[in-house]
From Swiss-Prot:
Component of the RNA polymerase I (Pol I), RNA polymerase II (Pol II) and RNA polymerase III (Pol III) complexes consisting of at least 14, 12 and 17 subunits, respectively. DNA-dependent RNA polymerase catalyzes the transcription of DNA into RNA using the four ribonucleoside triphosphates as substrates. Common component of RNA polymerases I, II and III which synthesize ribosomal RNA precursors, mRNA precursors and many functional non-coding RNAs, and small RNAs, such as 5S rRNA and tRNAs, respectively. Pol II is the central component of the basal RNA polymerase II transcription machinery. Pols are composed of mobile elements that move relative to each other. It holds the Pfam family RNA_pol_Rpb5_C. This is DNA-directed RNA polymerases I, II, and III subunit RPABC1. InterPro entries: Arch_Rpo5/euc_Rpb5, RNA_pol_Rpb5_N, RNA_pol_Rpb5_N_sf, RNA_pol_subH/Rpb5_C, RNA_pol_subH/Rpb5_CS, RPB5-like_sf. The gene is RPB5. SUPFAM superfamilies: Eukaryotic RPB5 N-terminal domain, RPB5-like RNA polymerase subunit. HAMAP family: RNApol_Rpo5_RPB5. Its main location: nucleus. Keywords: Nucleus, Transcription.
C-alpha cells in the first residue's frame, strides 16, 4: 500500500510539472489544472483498486493567442503518459501514428523506466512534427523552480534578429546551449533558437545573457 501511495504521489507531482512545462511553452493551461490536489488526482486517475491509470493523464494543449502572436508556427501539442514500464516498437509506433494523423506539431511521451533502441529509432519518422521523451522520475521536481536555475526566456524570430543586429553578431558568436540541457529540454528548444537568461547579480541587480540552441 505504501508503495502504491508513493507511486501515486510521485505521479501527481510529475503531472503537475508537465502541466507547468506546457504552460511555460506558451500553451493554455489553467491554474486550476496545475493546482489539482493529490486527493482529486487520485480520484480521477486511479481505478477501484487504487491503481493509477496513466492513459487517463493524457491531454491536448493549444497555444494561447499571445503565444501565437510571438511564435506563429506554434501548433497543438499532445502529452501521453505510458502505462508500460518498458516501451517497445508497437507502443511507440502507435504514438507516432497518433501524432501524425491528428496533425500535432509536438508529441511529449512520458515513460516509466525505459524505451528500447528500436522504438527510439521511430521518433524522427514523424517529421515535421517533433517527439520528445521524458522519464517520469525526471519530472517529479520542476527544475526551473530551483533557486540556482536562472530564468530562461525563448526569443521570437524577430527578437533574435534584433539581438544579432544590435550587437553585430553572427549566430556562431553566441554562447551555446545544448538541446539536451535540462532547461533546454523543458522549453522544447530547437536548433537555432535563442534563449535569454536572466541572472541575479549582487552588484547590478539583474543581468541578461543569451545562448543559441545547437
Amino acid at each position: 500500500m505504501e508503495d502504491t501511495d508513493r507511486t501515486i504521489s510521485r505521479l501527481w507531482r510529475s503531472f503537475k510539472t508537465v502541466k507547468e512545462m506546457v504552460r511555460d511553452r506558451g500553451y493554455y493551461i489553467t491554474q486550476e489544472e496545475i493546482d489539482m490536489s493529490l486527493a482529486e488526482f487520485r480520484s480521477r486517475i486511479c481505478d477501484s483498486m487504487n491503481v493509477p491509470q496513466r492513459k487517463l493523464m493524457c491531454f491536448q494543449a493549444n497555444p494561447t493567442a499571445e503565444s501565437l502572436e510571438k511564435f506563429p508556427d506554434l501548433g497543438s501539442l499532445w502529452v501521453e503518459f505510458c502505462d508500460e514500464a518498458s516501451v517497445g516498437i508497437k507502443t511507440m509506433r502507435n504514438f507516432c501514428i497518433h501524432i501524425s494523423e491528428k496533425n500535432f506539431s509536438t508529441g511529449i511521451f512520458i515513460y516509466q523506466s525505459s524505451i528500447t533502441p528500436s522504438a527510439n529509432k521511430l521518433i524522427p519518422t514523424v517529421s515535421p512534427a517533433s517527439i520528445e521523451t521524458f522519464q517520469e522520475g525526471d519530472l517529479v521536481v520542476n527544475i526551473t523552480h530551483h533557486d540556482l536555475v536562472p530564468k530562461h526566456i525563448k526569443l521570437a524570430r524577430d527578437e533574435k534578429k534584433e539581438l544579432l543586429e544590435r550587437y553585430r553578431l553572427k549566430e556562431s558568436q553566441l554562447p551555446r546551449i545544448q538541446r539536451e540541457d535540462p532547461v533546454g529540454r523543458y522549453l522544447g528548444l530547437k536548433r537555432g533558437e535563442v534563449v535569454k537568461i536572466i541572472r541575479r547579480s549582487e552588484t547590478s541587480g539583474r543581468y541578461a545573457s543569451y545562448r543559441i540552441c545547437l
